[in-house]
Amino acid sequence: MNEGAATAVEREVASWTGVTTGDTGRGGLKLSYGKVELGHLHGDSFADLPFPKKARDELIEEERASVHPPLPNSGWMRRRMDGTGDAEAVIELFRMNYDRAKARAERSSSGADLRMNRYEG
């Protein structure tokens, strides 16, 4: 049986530590790390992902994604999924966001630990 692109993306990304899934409220499937949305899927058609604007512009220039039509001047971008091969490219984009969100959370946690240690001694 051939699984759809969205199923492949959801199965992989949801298996990463700390990732949760939920409804976007607009008919999509949201994938998050903690309180940070990594992106969301619109069925097997496309994925929308938020990136820092500079990174988004580079990914669009590299033709790995396109401008997000509803928010063309934001950091959001869109990646079409025409098959399982595209699922791998979308998973790679989610991994980039996951690594960034996880690193930010770890830095934040380390900072909190340092602040707490100052008051403990």
Named regions from a protein language model:
Residues 1-121:
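Charge-dense, helix-prone N-terminal extensions
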